[in-house]
């Protein structure tokens, strides 16, 4: 067919239906954090920075939206990406931003397999960003 994964998703309603259904169902699953207390015991953690971050990854989206968007990219492209950076304004001290896989322009590697940096472009602003792997 000669179409990219993104073009297939845009033009095939059945593919969109399956991807949307699966991504939404996965996003409904709770993500829980645990603290290991001993070799065979763990206690659910609801107050750590990680637990807080996963519930509220950034000021623009919920944890459900983060997982749904990430799963959609994973199901379409086979991978997804988050930009995790310190943020003193957030409750956890961190933010997670989902970067749409379609924005990636270049993945530089050491040996063809191991990435050392990613370059992506926001199509709305044409801003190019390169981040280390």
Name each model-derived stretch.
Residues 1-133:
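Structured, contiguous alpha/beta core segments that scaffold functional sites
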């Amino acid at each position: 067919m000669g179409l990219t994964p993104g073009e297939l998703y845009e033009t095939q309603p059945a593919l969109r239906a399956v991807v949307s259904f699966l991504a939404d169902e996965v996003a409904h699953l709770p993500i829980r954090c645990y603290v290991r207390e001993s070799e065979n015991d763990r206690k659910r953690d609801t107050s750590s920075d990680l637990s807080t971050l996963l519930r509220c990854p950034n000021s623009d989206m919920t944890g459900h939206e983060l997982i749904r968007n990430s799963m959609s990219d994973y199901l379409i492209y086979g991978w997804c990406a988050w930009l995790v950076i310190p943020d003193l304004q957030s409750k956890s001290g961190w933010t997670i931003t989902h970067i749409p896989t379609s924005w990636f322009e270049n993945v530089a590697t050491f040996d063809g397999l191991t990435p050392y940096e990613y370059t992506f472009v926001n199509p709305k602003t044409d801003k190019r960003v390169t981040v280390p792997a």
